[in-house]
Every structure is written in C-alpha cells, then in structure tokens.
Amino acid sequence: MSKLPLGKRLKIRSMVHMAAEPIPNFWPMRTFIHHNPLHGLEHLPFEQAVRQGEKLFHARGFLPREDYQRYHKEGRVDQNSIKRDIADFISKQETLNGLDLASLLSDLMCSVKNKVTRTRALADHDDVFQALHGKQLENAEALDLKALTQRLCAQFAPERPLYEAIDLLFGTQMGTTLDELVIKSCLDFFDEGQSTIQMPGRHQGLFAAWTALAKRNLRLFLRGMHIKQILDQDDTPEGIIAYILDELGIEEAHWDGLITRELTRLHGWAGFIRWRSSSKHYYWAEQYPGDLIDFLAIRLVLGLALIREHSRQKRTPMTVKVLQEYIEGHTAECYLRQAYYGGCILPAFAHDVDDALSHKKPQRINNILPGYLRQQRQFEATRQADALRDLASKAGQTDALMALNAPQIKQLMTLIEAFENEEGMIWLRAMESVYRREIINQIQLYAPHKKEKRPFAQALFCIDVRSEPIRRNLETVGEYQTYGIAGFFGVPVSYIGLGKGSEVNLCPVVITPKNLVLEVPVGATSIETDFYSSADHVLHEMKSSILSPYFTVEAAGLLFGFDMIGKTIAPRRYTQIRNHIEPKAQATRLLVDKLTREQADSIVRSLQRAMIVRAIHQEFGIEREAVTDAMIRELREAAMDNYHEQTEFARRFALSPTAETQFIAGLKKDYKINRSFVSMQMERLARIGFSLDEQVFYVDKALTSIGLTENFSRFVLLAGHGSTSDNNPYESALDCGACGGSHGLVSARVLAHMANKPEVRRRLAKQGIQIPEDTWFVSVMHNTTTDQLSLQDLDLLPNSHLVYLERLRNGLRAATRLSAAERLPALLDHPSPNIDTLSAQKQIERNASDWTQVRPEWGLARNASVVAGGRHLTEGANLSGRTFLQSYDYRLDPKGRHLENILSNPLIIGQWINLEHYFSAVDNEHFGSGSKAYHNVVGRFGVVTGNLSDLRTGLPAQSVLKDGRPYHEPIRLLAIIEAPAAFTLEVAGRLPKVMSLITNGWITVVVVDPETGDRLFYDRGEWYNLNNDPQYTPSVKPLLEEELSA
C-alpha cells in the first residue's frame, strides 16, 4: 500500500505528464515517423521555441555562423534581407555616436567567424574598456566572497539535479553513471525480442518488474547502492518520487522544473516511453506496460542511491540545503572546484589547483583564489576587448571604437549581445528569401487549358518531394498527366499482411483508422479458409509473434556468409541472382469489401469449430478423425447455452456429467466460445473492409481533391512509394510518411480496387463523375531508391488493355532512367560529367543492394516547399526534388473541405518532415542521431551510439550532411497555395493549429490568388504583395471571368 494519499499521487502523475510536454514522441524505427523535435513548443513563436529548445536539449537551433557565411558566398543568402533586418534591429536601439552600426553588424555577420560577445564571469564593461586601451584593471585584487557565493548558488539552482551539482564540484561523474544504469534498465525491460535473455516479471509493468530485480541486485548492494532501503519506503512510483524529492530537500515549487530536466537528460528514451504508453494497440505496450512515472521513479531511486554512496565514500553533500551550506562555508574551494571540474580552469593554475584540492589544503586554496580571480578577470576582459577590436578593424571603424567611453562600451556590448541572439533568425530569413524568390519566379499563373486529346495515362503520385523528378520526367517522355496526392490516397486503413500477426496503420499518425484490410492468398477455396489464416489476430487475443520465423544458427550463418560476400563485391548482380533463385512472392488479394452478416457468422462458427477440435485434443488427447462434425456442432451449442442435454461426445467417450460440465465450462472461459465473445468477434469483423457508401466516398474524395473529375485516360496509375536498402535501420524513414512510415503500395491497391468496382462507378456517375468503361486504375510501386515504377495486379487488367501494356512500360522505364541520371551525381563523391541514363540506372540499383552503402538515397533531404494547386503552376519547372506537390483545384471545392484536409494533414506532415531535417542539419549530434557508422540496433525498435547511449531520435548525419557540411538546406517549409486570398484565409481560420503554425512562424506561406494575380506573403504578422517587389517577375494578368466559370 502507498503511504501517499490518492490526491497527491494523481497530482504527481499530472506533474510528470506536464513536465514531459516539451519532449517529442519517438516511434519505433521500423515505422519511423518524421517529427518536429520541438513539437511540444509549437505553441510558442519559432524563435522563442528555438531558444527554449536549446536550453532543454543542450543543442543548437541555428547553424554556426561559418556555415551561413559559406551559404552567403554561394549566393544562397539575400543581402537585401539582411540589410532590412539589421536596419529594423538598429531602429529599436539607442544610437552610438561615431559608429556606423549598420556596417558594423553587417561585417559581424559576414566577416567575423566567431561570436563577438564572450562569456564573462568576472570582467565587467569597465574592465573591457580598460583592456581595450591597454590599461591595468582597477581593483584587480578585490575579492567579494559574498558575490561569489551568490553566483555559485545561482549556478546550482533547485531545478538542477543535485548529482549534477556534485559532479561539477567534485568530479564524481554520477550523472554519466546514472544515465548508464537507467539505459541498461530500459534495454532489459523494453526489449522486443532481440535479447536472448528476457527480464522476468515484465507483465507486471516497468516499475514493479524493475523493483523486484533491484531489491535483489547483489552487485549494486556490494558497491554501496542500498536501493532496497529506498524502495521499501513506498510500493508505488508516485510515492517513491515524492519521498525522494522530499529526502533531497527540494521544495515542491521546483518539482516541475527538476522533473523536466531529469526527463530531458535522456529525451530519446523518454520520448519512446511517452509514445509507447499512449499507444493503445501497440502489442508490446499491452503486454509489458510502462510509463514516464515508472521511468522517473527508477531514475530518482538510482540517483538517490548514487548520492548516498558518494556521500559515504567522499563526504559529498546529500541534500540541496547541505550543498548550499557547503558553498557558503567553502566559497573559495567551490569556485575553484567548479572551474577545475567544469573544464574551464586557466591552464597556468591547473596544477596548483589540482594539488590543493586533492590534498585538501584549505589555506593554500584561499591563497590561490585572489591571484586566480585577478588572472581570470584580466583574461576575460582582454579576450572581449580583442574581439571588439577585431570586429571594428574588419568594419574599418577602429578609431570610432576607441573613441567610445566606458558607458558607451557597455551599451555596445549589450547591443552586440542582443544582436547575436537574433542573428540566427536574420540568416534564416535571408536564406528563405532566396529560395522563395527562386520558386515563385518559376510559377506560371495562367488559366489551365483544356486538352482536347485524351492523355495516354494519368498517374497519381504521393506528394513526397521524391515524386517531383519522376513526375516531371514522365511528362516529358509521352502523353502523361500527373497528379499529387497524399500517399495514403485519402483512405485511412489498418492492414494485416499475409502471415503477419499485427496491424499496421497506413495513414498519417494524426489519424486513427476505423477500417481494417486483410491480405489473403489468391486461389483460396473459400472465404473461411482465407480468414482462418489472416484474421486470427483480429478474432482472438492470442500472443502472436510479429517477428520473422526462427531458423537454425547454422543456416543463418551460411546465409549471412553468402549475403556478405555477394552484397559487398557485386551487390546488383548478386541481388538479381538471388531474386531469380528465391521463390516468387505469393499472389495475393486485399479484402476491401465489407462482410455480410452471414459471412461474418460463418467465419466465427468456423473458428469456433477449430477451437473445439483443439480443445478436445489438448484436454483428452483425442484426434480429429475420432470426432464427428455433429459432436463438434453439439458442443458448440452447449457452450453457447443453446443445448442443455448430454452431448453425443460425452456419451461416445464416456465422460461423467461432472467432466462434461467442466469441459464445457472450459470451452466458455479458456477457449472463448461464449455469447459475449461472439458479440465481440462480430464487432471486430465489422471493422474489416469498407461498405459501398464508404468506397464511393473515398474514391470521390480522392478524385475531386486533386481536380481529376473528367477526361479520364485509359490507364490511371496509383503510385504508392517505398524504398529498398540493405543494412539500414532508417529504411522506414525513407518510406511514405503519409502511410505512417510504411510502403504506400497497399493504399494504392485499396483505392484501385474501389475505383474499378462497377457499383462504385455507377454511384459516382450519379454524383457527376463519369469514369469511362475503358478506364482502369492500376496500382504501381514507386521505389524511391531506384525510381523504378512496377505495375501491380496485372492479372486483373482487362484483355483490351494488354495491347497498350508494353508502351506503358517503356514510358515508365524511360522516366526511371532520366530520374536516375538526375539524382546520381548528388550521391557520388566524384560524379562523371557525361554519364548515360542506363549506366546511371545500374549504379542507382547497385546502391540499393549494397549493404556497405550508408546513403542509398538522399530521401527527403533539401525539402523546402509544398505547392497546393494545379499542375499548370509548376509544369515544366525543374523544382530539383525539393517540393511537395499537392494537386488542388479550388473551383471544385466551394466549401473549402478539400483545402481544410490539405492544410490539416499533408501540410502538417510536410512541416514535421521539414523540421526533422532542419534540426538534424543544424545540430546533428543533439537533434539528429550522429553517424550511422557508430550505430547499433537495440531492442528491435531503436538505435544507440556505441553500446550505451540515449536513443538516437533524429536523422543520421548521412541523411543531411555531406563531407561534414549541411547537404540539406535548413530553412522552414514554404507553403504555396493557389486559391483566392479571402477564401484561403477563411478556410485556414477554421483550423486553429494551422493558424498557430503560420502566425508563430513554424511555416511560411504565399497565397497565389488566380482571380487577382496577387502573390501574398505572410511575414511576422503582415501580408505583403510580392508583385510590389522588383525581385519577383511580374505575375500574369488575372484570369478572365468567363474562364473561371468555364
């Protein structure tokens, strides 16, 4: 029983959940979901959130100045934008006579490598003024112990974990030890089948299972960590949290801040646990529950045990109060300790300080301190003066600087510090200005001309930026018309693949699907047979493994050896040979249609009969051939309370009335053959498939949302996309974000099935969408690693279309080769200038098969914009694979429902992808996941660096950096929307989340108004017409009224 009242326990749970808000969720790697690392701070303006994120995650929110300066030299930065922002900044400052601040700040950005304002613990502006003029510092020997004490106590605020303060003062490294112990505990508990030894008692939950082990952990006890004494104080994680925080002497007012700091030390693990505990249908979470309250309690237990261990061994403080008293009583010692163990000691004093501290010589410490403070103060003042002098020299304003008096130097230093805090945003806006001008000047605002000739084929691609090159190239090789749509084709669905035991949600993570689709083999003798293998997971709560089948160590080793040799020496050829030798994948169909009640009832009965056969064999050892169908049917009726006489089974096998009653009771309880479970089974079966009304709705929605409602071609290709690469834990990060990090082919097959159904087409015709009889929707797999386009389910293709099939394949093949030749140079260190398309395709295929290849494709790197509008806006423009292309025609959307959907789904997903790349590029070590070369897969759900580290949550260096420099250009997503301005703002106003992202600057927006020709850009609370900016090419005249109504 907990000693803590229920109200206090609930308060602590709420406190932990609130403290975890800034920590983003982290999904398992097998379904990698792009996310904004600062998602929990999106309620703040972008610039403010970045600053807070820098403090929370000890990261950098903007590129180093040197990288921006390189972009500036390459013409990727708008100098006019920099000038405007500098002028705006200066207008808010007091003037400094004699200094040209505009020139000074411009040179600071473009000519000075390092920050001008330096960290100063002791030197003030008067000291800097003296150093600037080569004078000795005044009162250099002065020693204000009270001020030092206050500075030290402020440095060790109550929100800072006590062990961090002790580490900094005594070099104990408890924080590192604590992190390692917590990580090991997480690895043991959250493992999903990778480890050969499983942690016992996991079904009890994280805290209970860990407690049971920790109380008996002899190794920790022998080293002096008396964990059992702590755990005996309460048997709930909330009670333990309250006990420890009270024991450490931390006032409740500071609990929020301390909890956030504890969680962000391992924000990868915290993000995974946070996601896992909120995922209701995640198999491993259902089996082995654990949440952040458990995680925090374990961390605090281990932390307190370490603090007590070190206190006994090294006499370090055990509470916040004792720490403060120690600082007040040993100020000189603590000041030198934090400098020495913090790594910022002046080199000339390092040996003396080390000797004095290690031999505990108080008098010597007191003697060292005055000279140390004098030297540190002089060092800080001289370093700051040198930085100011260097800046003035580069700006040609040395005389003006030297003419400033001490108060003016203070004013200048304050001004420069404030400017350098804003500098990152100035660089960012200037880079965005260049890209915005480039893409807007490529947009063609003209009335779409109706083409009389029917296209040979129409193709619907995912809006993914990797679709832009293949779409553009496909349009150049023939009479192809392409569209952009979210990769789940607007149909949210859960999916169970053939032979799989778990559902996969194929839709954006912000949507929860209601319908379930099953994959079944072609040629099954009956629908019951299909379901018997595919629907077992849906109908029974059995522990089915989602892992690959086991095979012997010898066989695994042999296969591994062949793979290692083949995929290293000749990866492309080896893959071709292996694919030829291995059996082809079984042909399958998707169960897309809703079941009738008779079908569902037949399935339930079939499964119940199978369970009764299993029960008879398990309970009595009787084989199936000894039991008649009539016996099974009678037992089923008895279990369902429809039959109350002695059964034929009991008579045949001489069961006593008691044995028969017990067996039937077991059928009800253990084998789930009862009325309530049948009702639940029928409800679950009702999830399978889509009704006719639903199918009509989704096909209509998909077609009208992209403006494809007439002039259908013979082939309408639905291209779902995914990637192929070997030895790549981040493979799902290259798959379809709109499909929850899975391949998009299933979604394409689902919509194709619906759109090809005659009943659906008849209903659509009544709604005004006439799909010709000779139009056939074909699902296509778009492999983004190789740009291959593979036609699917061709056995369903009407005979009348076979004659056109080779022409279609030739066009797709040509587009593939053109795209390969376009993408290859960026993947090579030394690309050939004259590589032909066939050779490019072969090299791209080799990369996909080569498991030594750390970068099989660039994925979504360099993504920068999303365009929602007609293809005429960008047709013929080379957008360099940087743009999400969403087809949209506002004229078919009078109520704005389709635009609502685009803004609240594809735009949000695009923003997550964009900011994942942005932050992984600006600070790959903290927001990204570092180099793949040091990664190890853990638990089958994540990666760590080396053997032990926080879960790496962002993108690896190989996804965003090239030769150590950003390959991804880190700018915010630019949304370009083609629709009347008033209409767009009215629709966006219905979506508070979207408006918040716009007004807080997480995305930038340009509205292209086809009725007025205006191009309106939103920036910091104001709308600006880009037509008034001479840097933008003039837009064409507005569309004529008769054209709009045509």
Swiss-Prot record:
Provide the assembly information.
Forms a complex with DabB1.
Q: Supply the source organism for this entry.
A: Halothiobacillus neapolitanus (strain ATCC 23641 / c2) (Thiobacillus neapolitanus)
Q: What this chain does, per the record? A: Part of an energy-coupled inorganic carbon pump.
Give the residues the record marks as binding Zn(2+): 462, 464, 721, 736
The protein depicted here goes by the name Probable inorganic carbon transporter subunit DabA1
Cofactor(s) for this UniProt protein:
Zn(2+)
**This protein's superkingdom?**
Bacteria
Alphabetical list of HAMAP family matching this protein: DabA (MF_01871)
Similarity comment: Belongs to the inorganic carbon transporter (TC 9.A.2) DabA family.
Instruction: Explain what the UniProt record notes about the effect of disrupting the gene for this protein.
Output: Required for growth in ambient air.
Q: Does the keyword Cell inner membrane apply?
A: yes
State the taxonomy lineage. Answer: Bacteria, Pseudomonadati, Pseudomonadota, Gammaproteobacteria, Chromatiales
Going by the UniProt record, its keywords in alphabetical order are: Cell inner membrane, Cell membrane, Membrane, Metal-binding, Transport, Zinc
The way this protein sits in the membrane is described as: Peripheral membrane protein
**Gene Ontology MF, one:** zinc ion binding
Gene Ontology cellular component terms for the protein in this record: plasma membrane
